[in-house]
Every structure is written in structure tokens, then in C-alpha cells.
């Protein structure tokens, strides 16, 4: 479920070098930059081909979120969540909240065409897989992106001619306490999945067990929608789990994110 859409919890490809991987530093390589308004903070594993988790939210240098050794982490800080994570325009669900925009496609394009090439520019090999993980509206975006992403062949990222085997940008997604109540989401996911493979292999969905206990007529269906979405993804051949956590939307945000990451990279 999404928390107040106007409040976001704190959490905060590519060319490749010719250097031998044995010369790379033993500790993760950290870099920071801003790309098209997105704050990027990378901690890249020195292991060649290491999976990469793209974590949506506020970049936090001392984030308690941890990934195992041999997994890289890219924090992506995004402002104006109701605009930049919303896939299409929709009216506000809280009296004092903003309406939703339609900036998700622009955000996804920026991730694929600018953020990933920069973040992965010093890698010696493509990652084994990429995971996209977010909380609340960022979780909605992760799910939407997972069934929307356009595939590109691996050769394209290496500057070669494309073959006929497209590969999804993100193979795994985590939608943690996601805004599964968002209008039109169920129909959209149905439409995308009915078109064939979307490139996802794993999907993690979760909610707090009190998130649906609200008089808000839109949000009260969040658990029902989450369970339906998990079933749709599983039936499409995507390894999927739906987890209920104790509490409301704002409870133990970091712990819930950690559980998602642990499942996605196990």
C-alpha cells in the first residue's frame, strides 16, 4: 500500500574497461553524481559480474540497508514522487495531497539510458542480473517498470550490432508496501502480461497487515490488489512472493526494505 502519496520514506549500460579484474580494488567502489535531477550513489562490488540492486529513494550515505558481499548497490534519489513515480495521471487520494502526474516513463528512460550506463561504466562484465526496489510509490514504480521495460540485446550495451534476443533491463523487482491501490494498475499489469514475456524472473511484493484498515475508498483495496497482482505474476511464470509484515505503512520501513533485498539476492 502506499503511504501518503505526498510523503516518501527515507531509504536512501555501459562501456567496460580493459583492465584486468585482478587489479580492481578489494573494497566496493563508491561514486556519486546527479543525472537529470536524480541523485546517484553507487557502491560497486569488485566481483566481476556481480548482481546490482537499484534502490529507489533518498540517497543516504549511511543507509542501514545492506547487501551481501558480491552484490553492488546503486541508490537513486528522486524528488516529487507523485510526479516522477506515477505512470499516468490520477486524482489525489488525500485531501491535502497533490494529484498524480505521468512522469514514470521519463524516470524509467533516464534510468535505462543515463543512470545505468554511468553506474556500470567501470564494470568489466555485465551484471548477472539487475534488481529494482522501491517503497510506497517507488514500489509502484518498480512493479510498473518491471512489466513495462523495453528490452535491448546485451550486445547493444557493448556497442555491437543487436541480435534478435532482447533482454530486460531489470530481471527482478521489489515493491515494498507498494501503492497497489493505484487506479488502473491491475488492468495494466494484465495487459502487459498477456502480451508475453516481460523479462522478469523474480518479483517481491509486501504490505503491512494494517495498511488496508482505512476508510479511504481507494486505499482500502490495497491488500486485495496486492494478492491479485502476486497471483498474476506467478501465473505468468515469474517467481513471486507476497509477504505481510506487522504494522501500518510507515512501520519498520528499513526492515521491510532489507527483507525485500534479502529475498531478491538470495
Specify the residue positions occupied by each region the protein language model found.
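Asp/Glu-rich intrinsically disordered low-complexity tracts
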Residues: 4, 8, 12, 16, ...
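Non-catalytic cap/lid and distal C-terminal segments of serine-dependent acyl enzymes
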Residues: 2-5, 24-266
